[in-house]
């Protein structure tokens, strides 16, 4: 379940290489783990998830948040899994962004404004220096699905599960970053773990 992520974390010298036409620069990266979340905090997460996911609790039993693909020259350029203690504040901040949409509706994979199941959603990941966030629906028709909030458009369902989300992230980090991160890594062409 966490094997692709653990493989990523074990990379001895992770780096991106920019496209040749952009100079071919190497961007040294780091993947940062933290001490495990407390049993009480993980139990609270499990309660919030309402049985919609088992991957996040397993992950937080190993590390209370993660920083992945962090630029060694500027660690704020990164993808992160939030520490459990920050999830409520990030959800409140994302709610303010969702309120800026003029409509509240769902259209296939797209969600505009505040979804009807928002109260039970869990905001768990995002990018440094950007308002983009990832959240999990824990109730309703999208229960267990992962959504990506893009502050210039709407929220989009991008994975049918947290495991599927981690597969997207770990299997092709370049495509993941270029698809979802609007602040940095525009010119990357390849990812190398060593």
Locate predicted features.
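Beta-sheet entry/capping signal
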Residues: 121, 133, 145-146
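Local beta-strand/beta-hairpin segments that build beta-sheet-rich folds
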Residues: 124, 157-159
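Acidic, proline/glycine-rich low-complexity IDRs
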Residues: 160-194
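Intrinsically disordered, low-complexity regulatory segments enriched in Ser/Thr/Pro
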Residues: 142-153
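Short, surface-exposed beta-strand/loop micro-motifs that present aromatic residues
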Residues: 132-139
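Acidic surface patches and DE-rich sequence motifs
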Residues: 127, 139, 150
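Glycine-centered tight beta-turn/hairpin loop motif at sheet-sheet or coil-to-beta transitions
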Residues: 129-131, 153
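A surface-exposed partner-binding patch
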Residues: 1-129, 181, 192-194
């Amino acid at each position: 379940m966490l094997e692709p992520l653990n493989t990523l974390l074990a990379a001895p010298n992770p780096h991106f290489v920019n496209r040749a036409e952009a100079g071919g620069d190497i961007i040294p990266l780091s993947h940062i783990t933290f001490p495990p979340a407390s049993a009480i905090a993980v139990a609270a997460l499990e309660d919030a998830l309402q049985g919609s996911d088992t991957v996040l609790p397993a992950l937080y039993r190993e590390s209370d948040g993660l920083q992945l693909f962090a630029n060694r020259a500027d660690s704020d350029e990164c993808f992160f899994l939030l520490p459990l203690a920050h999830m409520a504040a990030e959800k409140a901040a994302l709610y303010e962004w969702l309120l800026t949409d003029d409509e509240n509706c769902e259209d296939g994979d797209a969600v505009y404004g505040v979804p009807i199941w928002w109260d039970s959603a869990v905001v768990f990941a995002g990018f440094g220096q950007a308002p983009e966030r990832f959240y999990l629906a824990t109730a309703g028709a999208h229960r267990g699905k992962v959504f990506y909030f893009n502050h210039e458009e709407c929220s989009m369902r991008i994975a049918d599960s947290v495991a599927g989300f981690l597969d997207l992230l770990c299997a092709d980090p370049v495509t993941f970053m270029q698809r979802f991160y609007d602040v940095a890594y525009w010119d990357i062409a390849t990812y190398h773990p060593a």
